[in-house]
Design a protein with these regions (language model features):
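Flexible loop/turn segments at secondary-structure boundaries
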Residues: 15-16, 176-180, 203, 235, ...
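Gly/Thr-rich phosphate-binding beta-strand-loop-beta motif of the actin/hexokinase/Hsp70
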Residues: 1-31, 49, 325-345
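Conserved phosphate-binding/catalytic loops in two-lobed NTP-binding clefts
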Residues: 183-208
Length: 345
């Protein structure tokens, strides 16, 4: 029986990857939708907490605290990291140790007691400073996650529209350890959401297993269109005038994106995509340089179009051949593994 599943993978660095695979009857995997993701991970929650501190103490105090007491600053965020991973959203308050030096520095630089400024701040009713600690209302602590979790839910919801009959959503990675993030995902997507016992180490274990059994993924979906920059005969009714180039009496159009693979195309791992023949534009060359480009668009016209970027250059030695114009370079792109391979025959 085939099963379709999303794998939602988050990293401590602040990014998230979402992939969709179908488990085939032989146990191998087929990619159903190209990997997607964005800048929504645990680091974004840390930044929300930092902005929260700025609202209380002001930008100058936080900057000076980091400069003068870097060890205390880092320890504060290390403590926050532990609380972030354990937070489930069920308690009324979140309480943890808070550096007294920050309170002293605020009073020294601002000349007022912190309690007065707290009450005058936008978040004054949500926090207290009892005996070397900080107490934050659960509703405020949830707000640190809100933007990031909402982005994740929106991304997964959009993917669900493209992939019907989904069986499971698997959460792995450091940010997936958060009970609050897990509960929000279950609240939105129901019982199809689950995570392994150790979501952080699962990523490493998966990488090791894939290294040993790299053929387990039998089909992938291309995230980009891939092609070769080329020149072709200029046709004024079709081509941009600024791309017109004359060589040895022949008129060409330059920078054409000659597509080998289209974004969203399903390709078997190790499959040779149909190749194309390329000819040097002039004789007397000792080398030919193939420019490999990628684009987020399905059918880009020129390699200079928005969304196109250079993947790599391939230099071909032409010295053994005398008549270059009549000696074609047949180029194939091998797609499907963790690397893109360009073969020239």
């Amino acid at each position: 029986m085939k099963e379709r599943l999303f794998k939602f993978k988050t990293f401590a660095g602040g990014t998230a990857d979402i992939t969709c695979h179908e488990v085939l009857e032989d146990g191998n995997l087929a990619e159903l939708y190209h990997a997607t993701g964005g800048n929504y991970g645990g680091t974004n929650v840390d930044e929300a907490f930092r902005q929260f501190l700025v609202k209380i103490f002001g930008t100058n105090v936080i900057r000076e605290f980091k400069r003068l007491y870097l060890e205390d600053y880092l320890e504060l965020f290390a403590i926050f990291e532990r609380k972030k991973r354990l937070f489930d959203g069920k308690s009324d308050k979140v309480i943890f140790s808070f550096p007294y030096r920050l309170l002293e520095l605020h009073e020294s630089l601002c000349g007022v007691d912190i309690k007065r400024d707290v009450w005058n701040s936008p978040v004054g009713s949500d926090i207290e400073f009892p005996r070397g600690k900080i107490s934050i209302l659960s509703s405020q602590f949830k707000s640190f996650f809100d933007t990031t979790v909402s982005s994740i839910i929106q991304q997964v919801s959009e993917l669900l529209e493209n992939v019907p009959d989904l069986s499971y959503i698997i959460m792995v990675g450091g940010f997936s350890e958060s009970p609050y993030v897990y509960s929000r995902m279950q609240e939105r997507f129901g019982e199809m959401v689950f995570k392994p016992i150790e979501p952080s180490s699962t990523v490493l274990k998966g990488a090791v297993l894939f290294g040993e059994h790299h053929t387990i993924i039998t089909k992938r979906i291309s995230k980009y269109s891939y092609g070769i920059a080329r020149m072709m005969r200029f046709k004024p009714e079709m081509h941009r005038l600024d791309k017109r180039k004359e060589i040895d009496g022949f008129v060409f159009v330059d920078d054409v994106f000659n597509s080998h693979i289209e974004v969203g195309q399903s390709i078997k791992v190790g499959q040779d995509v149909e190749g194309y023949e390329y000819f040097p534009a002039t004789n007397g060359l000792t080398q030919a340089v193939l420019e490999v480009y990628a684009s987020k668009n399905r059918n880009p016209r020129y390699v200079t179009d928005e969304g196109c970027f250079l993947v790599g250059l391939l230099t071909i030695d032409l010295s053994p051949y005398e008549d270059h114009r009549h000696w074609p370079l047949r180029v194939k792109i091998l797609f499907g593994g963790t690397e893109l391979t360009v073969d020239v025959l």
